[in-house]
């Protein structure tokens, strides 16, 4: 795997400033040592709507198990299929879960780093 994912809270202006800095580095021929995929939310409330404790539990279980069907994951977590299905689809939409060619879901990240800055 060897892929990392960074989650944080940034304003639209901060997001575009970071993207601009990365583009400048690319133009200068500077590439990151290891690519890191990113997901930013505008505020903590939105982040917590997507990243609930149950979804973190699901991510952890799926990462440990490897690729699973939603049915197998629901059984492992001892949760209702529909609830697991909904959570998997949300996590897939925001990029934290991927589907392999066999139709099974997996967490391809070795590390998910979350940064939450407190207001000054």
Where are the language model's segments positioned?
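Short, hydrophobic-biased segments on the C-terminal half of alpha helices
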Residues: 88-89
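A short, conserved structural fragment
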Residues: 93-102
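Short, locally clustered residues in the helix-turn-helix/winged-helix DNA-binding domain
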Residues: 60-64
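Short alpha-helical segments that sit at the start of domains
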Residues: 29-57
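A short acidic, leucine-rich amphipathic alpha-helix
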Residues: 72-77
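Short, cationic-aromatic polyanion-contact patches
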Residues: 45-52, 69, 101-120
């Amino acid at each position: 795997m060897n892929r990392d994912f960074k989650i944080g809270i940034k304003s639209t202006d901060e997001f575009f400033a970071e993207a601009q800095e990365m583009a400048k580095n690319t133009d200068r021929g500077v590439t990151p040592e290891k690519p890191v995929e990113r997901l930013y939310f505008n505020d903590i409330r939105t982040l917590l709507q997507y990243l609930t404790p149950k979804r973190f539990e699901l991510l952890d279980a799926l990462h440990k198990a490897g690729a699973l069907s939603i049915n197998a994951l629901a059984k492992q977590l001892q949760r209702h299929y529909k609830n697991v299905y909904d959570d998997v689809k949300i996590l897939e939409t925001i990029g934290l879960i991927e589907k392999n060619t066999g139709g099974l879901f997996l967490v391809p990240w070795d590390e998910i780093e979350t940064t939450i800055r407190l207001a000054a």
